[in-house]
UniProtKB/Swiss-Prot annotation:
This is S-adenosylmethionine decarboxylase subunit alpha. Heterotetramer of two alpha and two beta chains. It comes from Acanthamoeba castellanii. GO terms for biological process: spermidine biosynthetic process. Its cofactor is pyruvate. GO terms for molecular function: adenosylmethionine decarboxylase activity.
């Protein structure tokens, strides 16, 4: 559960940087 949240935040951060 905790890892799922961490991965979600990482994906959002990557997408934000990316864009």
């Amino acid at each position: 559960s905790s890892m799922f949240v961490w991965n979600t935040k990482l994906i959002l951060k990557t997408c934000g940087t990316x864009l």
